[in-house]
Design a protein with these regions (language model features):
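Hydrophobic alpha-helical segments
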Residues: 71-75, 85, 95, 99
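Periplasmic-binding protein-like
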Residues: 4, 75-83
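Short hydrophobic/aromatic-enriched beta-strand-loop microsegments
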Residues: 2-7, 93-106
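A short acidic, amphipathic alpha-helical/loop segment
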Residues: 88-92
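Short, flexible loop segments at boundaries between secondary-structure elements
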Residues: 100-119
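Short, surface-exposed amphipathic charged segments that create phosphate/polyanion-binding patches used
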Residues: 1-4, 19-21, 45-48, 114-119
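Active-site rim beta-loop-alpha module in soluble metabolic enzymes
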Residues: 13-72
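Gly/Ser/Thr-rich loops at beta-strand to alpha-helix junctions
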Residues: 9-12, 81-87, 107
């Protein structure tokens, strides 16, 4: 299985970037960007948002992952690189059937390790 890494801009996650952090982008990594999302660019990338239409942003985020899934049917998980995207994790899972990892999930996982729940 491969991992779909979703970023604000696909240009920011180049092969050189991945190589610098020890990841071979040609081995089980698919990069999806929100470069063409008008709602994302307006709200998050310095555009002049008139309103914050989170439904539009959610739809664009899910669409980018569905497109990546179509291009690479071996995707088995999604990693949200952008800190704006975790609110859409459930929508992504509901639409794709894939588990979603993001910085909030990482914090919760580490918190559970430090403060385990008694069962």
């Amino acid at each position: 299985k491969s991992v779909a890494v979703v970023a604000a801009s696909i240009k920011l996650l180049s092969a050189e970037f991945f190589s610098a952090v020890g990841v071979d982008i040609n081995h089980r990594v698919t990069v999806a960007g929100l470069d063409s999302s008008a709602s994302f660019n307006s709200m998050c990338m310095g555009g002049k948002a008139v309103s914050y239409e989170t439904d539009d942003l959610r739809d664009d985020v899910v669409a980018s992952i569905l497109a990546a899934q179509k291009d690479d049917p071996k995707i088995g998980a999604v990693l949200l690189e952008c800190t704006t995207l975790p609110p859409f994790a459930k929508d992504i899972t509901d639409q794709t059937g894939l588990p979603v990892f993001d910085f909030i999930a990482c914090i919760e996982w580490m918190h559970r390790a430090i403060h385990p729940k008694r069962y």
